[in-house]
Amino acid sequence: MKRLALLLALAAPLAASAGESGLVIFHTQCSRCHGEDGRGKAVFTTPSFLTSKLTREEMEQVILKGRAKMPAFSTKLTPVEITSVAAYIKAGLPEK
């Protein structure tokens, strides 16, 4: 029981930091094309994250490899960063 409590206590900050890094990555790498609110920008006809039907795993692949007008981020982001930003987007772009 004590081990479970310890594991849960240690996991909470990791989950929080992953969410925070997703927020930071989104605002530094994604928002210039997809908008601060993730709705996309009409000028570029960039897809909205809010209506995306992609699963988190599919989104990770798009971030990794790129698609249509979106560049690949495989050389700019680590796999952990890609997972963090995809999870952040799929969570609805929370501010905290």
Report the location of each language-model feature.
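Positively charged n-region of N-terminal signal peptides that target proteins for export
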Residues: 1-4
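Electrostatic cytochrome c docking/interface patches
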Residues: 9-25, 37, 58, 96
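Soluble non-cytosolic domains of exported or imported proteins
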Residues: 20, 53, 76-80
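Gly/Gly-Pro-rich "capping" loops immediately C-terminal to redox-active cysteine motifs
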Residues: 23-27, 35-64
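Short, cysteine/histidine-rich loop/knuckle motifs that typically chelate Zn2+
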Residues: 32
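Short Fe-S-cluster ligation motifs
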Residues: 57-78
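C-terminal capping alpha-helices of c-type cytochrome domains
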Residues: 75-96
